[in-house]
Amino acid sequence: RREGQKNIYVETCPQYLLLTEDKFRDGGPEEGIKYMMAPPLRKKEDNEAIWQGLRDGSVQVIATDHCPFTEKEKLENVADFRNCPGGVSGVEERMPLLFSEGVLKGRISLERFVQATSTNAAKIFGLYPKKGTLMPGSDADVILINPAKTHTFGRNTLHTTCGYSPYDGMTTDCAIDLVMLRGQIIARDNTFTGQKGYGTLLHRKRTIAYEDIVRV
């Protein structure tokens, strides 16, 4: 659809790479309703097609669409899914999931992982090179991912107030040791250590040239 078009970019999310429509059936309606989102989950072959899009550069960004609701809010509409609020969590899960399932399993390169999770979004939204790269003058926004550790997602490991994750019980072959924002450590070993009010307003510039974003 975007072939031959300029300034059209493609974004996906972890759920469309790792989960399938089987989640709607597994565990019955009370479990399946928690996976309501738009667009809906599809088949395994659709997952693989998106992985291929990441490899060849036709998919440029992996975001989260982080829009969780509590189990209570979901289950209130189990009798009619059309009234169910759509959305799941993803902010905390995105990076370890994609590094483990993408880089460590050989689906995408480390370079593509960095582009899709950081650099390309910064270029599209006019924040590069302040964001999305490590070079003189850039913000020192860094995560340290440790492939010698593992991490299991569960109700007691996440900080979202929705109370569950679509990846509950899934174990990654890596863990995030620390997160830095503008050179300051704001999270270490799954614990927030930053200061309230440390965020700043970012003023965007023009989007980086299309060819520089989509080049393989």
What do the PLM-derived regions correspond to, one by one?
Residues 201-216:
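Short, solvent-exposed cationic patches
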Residues 34-45, 84-90, 165-171:
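A short acidic, glycine-rich active-site loop
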Residues 11, 65, 98, 183:
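Residue-level signal for inorganic ion chemistry
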Residues 76-80, 136-202:
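C-terminal cap of metal-dependent C-N hydrolases
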Residues 111-112, 153-160, 212-215:
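Short, positively charged
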Residues 30-35, 61-62, 68-149:
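His/Asp/Glu-enriched, well-ordered alpha-helical/loop segment
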Residues 16-20, 69-72, 123, 151-152, ...:
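Flexible loop/turn segments at secondary-structure boundaries
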Residues 1-62, 79:
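Histidine/acidic residue-rich metal-binding segments in metalloenzymes
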